Amino acid sequence: MMAAERGAWICFEDEAGHTLRPSKARTWAPRGRTPVIPVSGKGSGRISVAGLVCVKPGQRTRLLYRVKVHRPRKGERRSFAETDYAALLDAAHQYLKAPIVLIWDNLNTHVSVAMRELVANRDWLHVIQLPVYAPDLNPTEGVWSHLKRSLGNLAVTGVDHLAAVVKNRLKRIQYRPDLLTSFLTHTGLTLDPEPP
């Protein structure tokens, strides 16, 4: 059944991780003065971000996300668990107030038995798996690319500072539906139904 027939939002999900090590980017400096970004090297930890780019004809494109801070603890999972994804999807359903057609990759957490059970308990949710090795079909990858470029050469003081900066940058992207739509356009996917 097509999303339009159900009045559903089409949501593309993906996840990304960020560490305290700053990503390198190009910059300008006078000749002979190599710019140096001081990094303490102290502390550790990382953050994971799960995001949904949600589209529906006649509505502005939306970005919904969750940020999870990971501090190095023995035996602790360093990514999102099935219950974290379910909480994100429940929040998206409550926010969008409509059924969701979810399109995501074949990450082991997405195809696990526990995740299939969580999906089966949500009658408003229909899941479609992206083909293997096809990140170019997911507009959320464009969000991560844009976010990574905005974090270039940024030295953070700790994992909490990194989480705050990432949330701030994602908030900026949220207020730019034209940018979010451009990520969808870049994939080559369209919302127009194919003619019979």
Regions flagged by a language model, labelled:
Residues 1-196:
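Short functional hotspots at interaction and active-site rims
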